[in-house]
Amino acid sequence: MEAERLNAIESSLLDLRNRAGELRGYLDYDAKAARLTEVNKELEDPNVWNDSKNAQALGREKKLLEGVVTTLTALDSDLRDALDLFELAREEGDEDTLLASEEDAAKLEARVGDIEFRRMFSNPADPNNCFIDIQAGAGGTEACDWASMLLRQYLRYCERKGFKAEVLEESDGDVAGIKNATVKVTGEYAYGFLRTETGIHRLVRKSPFDSSGGRHTSFSSVFVYPEIDDSIEVEINPADLRIDTYRASGAGGQHINKTDSAVRITHMPTGIVVQCQNDRSQHRNRAEAMAMLKSRLYEVEMRKRQAEQDKLESSKTDVGWGHQIRSYVLDQSRVKDLRTNVEMSNTRAVLDGDLDDFISASLKQGV
């Protein structure tokens, strides 16, 4: 076995061990491990459920702490095993063992890279589930079709990431596509991964709805906001709400159009409107809509505070609601993020949910 190959594997494993050590420091492993022990003791107390809110908060904290402690503990253990296997391969000169060592190094590189990537989630709401609102812009059928393409793109992205995606509300376009849709995304760091997708998405293509084959430009807006749990107080005055019920539209069988199960809530001071029609129960739709409203109001307040802070830091990039963030030019096979300049030529893959390069760059650059 050539020395160069051995040196490369050893160098890779030692580098990974150093990076894992740095991650333990960055992620405050020792303090989190100690806190996890405390939380477990509190949850073992039979009286903990006398205060259900506190018990639920402890349960959420435990899950987040375990996400760091368990991950880093397993990583350290696997790195030690990989180094031991490498030493065995070097001593015995066994090709199969060396190949296994190379495979271990590649897998560990991916794991360390993933943990380093997760360090970029600095927003307090990053670990939360989230909602995605998609709204077709001006442009009639073409814009509605583009909105439906974006909806499919995000559903496929969620599928790739192992997130659960549930369409809570969807309004069909007059001819094709959708006018708007709301998706609830459930999964670890769902908001963290998706929050930089907020903005205007621009599509340029030869329209299938234009018999002359003309080139059309369409816009759709995407707004991502976190689901807020009960540990965060958001005051909503019932007098500020207008609650309407209506018959759900779309797929759902014979029952869906027989009762006014869909719920629309308007928050009159802000003009925010949320809708939910995915459940046959009006009660459950109303509860989901209230959760959406609470999350929207929280996000609006956070963005207001961020805007005030950004005024003091003029060098920061504007990533507001009306900001165009990505251009999809299909006839030139080019999708470009206008904030990070990341560009991909495989437009089909992007529209099939391959957004990792764009999202990774936007998080790394803090856009």
From Swiss-Prot:
Its main location: cytoplasm. Belongs to the prokaryotic/mitochondrial release factor family. It is found in: Cytoplasm. Keywords: Cytoplasm, Methylation, Protein biosynthesis. It comes from the Bacteria. Methylated by PrmC. Methylation increases the termination efficiency of RF2. The modification N5-methylglutamine is found at residue 254. InterPro entries: PCRF, Pep_chain_release_fac_I, Pep_chain_release_fac_I_sf, PrfB. One of its GO terms (molecular function) is translation release factor activity, codon specific. This is Peptide chain release factor 2. HAMAP family: Rel_fac_2. Peptide chain release factor 2 directs the termination of translation in response to the peptide chain termination codons UGA and UAA. PROSITE patterns: RF_PROK_I (PS00745). GO terms for cellular component: cytoplasm.
